[in-house]
Amino acid sequence: MGLTKGWAVLTDPPYGIGQDGGRGHRKSSGARVQAKKDWDRERPPAEVFAWLAAAPAGAIIWGGNYFADLLPPTMGWLYWQKLIGGDFSDGELAWTSRKGALKEFTYRKTNAEMVHPTQKPVALMEWCLGFLPDAKTILDPFMGSGTTLVACQRMGRHGTGIELDPDYFDVACRRVDEAARQPDLFVAPEPAPVQGGLEL
């Protein structure tokens, strides 16, 4: 069963390259959770990518170069230029279902707290949301530390996430709650619910 009309996917699945932490940190109540875990030992199966790629309102899948054999051909790649040196990669690729040429986002991570070893910047995910204008709900089925949902909260978009790891789930909930308490001044807030009266 596929996603229904209005749903889009913005996600960063496990790449299957063993990038699952290992710094020994484990404190989900506020700080780092980068403890040794086994979430990045295998890629999700091909059926998962077929399901994600068919999202009616569009799909953006980070690490798409690791899944090129599991996804349809695309010209609409997104590229994040990290502006970092050393042993790390210069950038990352996202597969998309959109039409059009490659688009580049140049952004250097700040010293913001990293709670997940492959955590993306909120600014990057906010940029991605601009490529999903028709989406009513954004799904991140590999939610991790919740960056996609934080971006949705800040941009006034509806987001839903799925995360199997309880530590990362707790962190994601905390980060989304914090984003909800610090609304973006340039995004119109959602109207408060109004209780209707019953006419007799």
Regions found by a protein language model. Give the residues of each.
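Class I S-adenosyl-L-methionine-dependent methyltransferase catalytic core
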Residues: 1-139, 145-200
